Structures are given as structure tokens and as C-alpha cells.
């Protein structure tokens, strides 16, 4: 552990790179790796509850922060998706929760998923949503990721569920960004992009 910056390297992976979102083979390999991990149906004794986290973050930054003029309306829309998610969610298993492309290390013959601090029991489709929103994918590229992950299970119901997760998760990261801003760290650009995604995918979830 580096005492100056807190960085810890437990094992250095030679000749590895993070998932390149411009390389479809990288994206395919990482998404299929994620699906394979979920299919193991691993269980732990703690869960990641998306809406519980939203409430927690709201409590830390103020229920109705004023970063955006229509934030109250947007919040109501995001909260209204909870019932849709509850009625459609798939069987929980151990999920990474933060499977962003930076956390996939790709080698010639192997893939490694790092940074498990948020992991817990959840709907595996939430992991797919998290992958897409961090990369700030447009709908066409998002649908391609969903297609790769779902394979033979691909259906409109699962797509709508992933869109709902994307909307709610984006709102969660808006709150996270606001908390960071209140502590003196500027994530405004990221916060704005996540806010736009939350509004956009709320609409897709209802179509």
C-alpha cells in the first residue's frame, strides 16, 4: 500500500488493458464474462438495495437539492419506477454493482473484474445498467450491450427493466455527485450527464 495516496496493488496483471468501448470484441468479451459470473448464482449475506441507497444519499445531500430546476419532478418520476422494477426484477445473485469498463482488465486469454466495494445481492440486470450508464452510451449502443448480455433471453420486458434500472441508477449517481460537490469535489459535468440519462431512460422504460 502506498502510504501517500492509499493505492494498493495486490497483484499486477501483465499486458492488460481496461475494456475499450470502441472495440466491440472487448465489449462482447466483458459482457459475456459478466453474464457467466451471474450465471454462477453466487450468494452472500448482504444486499445492494438501489432505492435504499437513493434514500441514503438523499439524506446526505438534502431531499430536494437544487442543482437542476426540475429535480423534484424528475425525482418523482424516478421513484415511480420502483413498482415497475419490483414487479419485473429477476432472481437476485451476487452482483458487482460497479462493473464499469474501467473495472474490466482484459488480457489475451483472460478477463478480470476488479473493485468490488459496492458488491452485494441484487438483480443481475442492474449490473448491465451500471455498465451502460458509466459509458454514457446512446440508446443504439445500449441496446447492443443488452443484446449481447441477454442472448437467447432477449425480450422487451427485460429491456424495459434495464432502462428503468438505468434511470434510477443515474439518479443515484447524481446524488453521489452532489454529495461530492458538498464536500468540495467538483463532479458537475458527470452529474449533469447522469441527470440527462436519468430523464432519457425514464422515458424509454415507459415506452
Language-model segments: what does each one mean?
Residues 1-51, 58, 62-73:
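ATP-binding pocket architecture of kinase catalytic cores
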Amino acid at each position: 500500500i502506498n502510504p501517500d495516496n492509499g493505492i494498493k496493488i495486490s497483484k499486477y496483471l501483465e499486458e492488460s488493458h481496461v475494456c475499450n468501448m470502441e472495440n466491440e470484441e472487448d465489449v462482447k468479451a466483458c459482457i459475456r464474462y459478466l453474464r457467466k459470473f451471474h450465471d454462477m448464482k453466487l450468494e452472500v449475506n448482504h444486499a445492494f438495495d438501489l432505492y435504499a441507497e437513493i434514500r441514503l444519499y438523499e439524506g446526505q445531500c438534502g431531499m430536494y437539492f437544487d442543482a437542476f430546476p426540475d429535480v423534484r419532478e424528475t425525482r418523482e418520476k424516478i421513484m415511480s419506477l420502483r413498482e415497475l422494477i419490483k414487479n419485473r426484477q429477476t432472481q437476485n445473485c451476487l452482483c458487482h454493482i460497479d462493473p464499469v469498463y474501467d473495472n474490466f482488465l482484459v488480457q489475451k486469454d483472460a478477463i478480470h473484474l476488479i473493485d468490488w466495494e459496492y458488491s452485494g445481492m441484487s438483480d443481475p440486470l442492474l449490473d448491465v445498467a451500471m455498465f451502460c450508464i458509466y459509458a454514457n452510451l446512446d440508446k443504439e449502443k445500449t441496446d447492443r450491450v443488452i443484446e449481447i448480455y441477454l442472448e437467447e433471453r432477449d425480450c422487451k420486458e427485460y429491456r424495459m427493466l434495464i432502462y428503468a434500472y438505468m434511470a434510477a441508477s443515474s439518479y443515484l449517481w447524481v446524488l453521489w455527485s452532489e454529495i461530492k460537490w458538498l464536500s468540495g469535489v467538483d463532479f458537475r459535468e458527470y452529474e449533469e450527464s447522469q441527470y440527462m440519462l436519468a430523464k432519457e431512460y425514464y422515458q424509454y422504460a415507459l415506452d
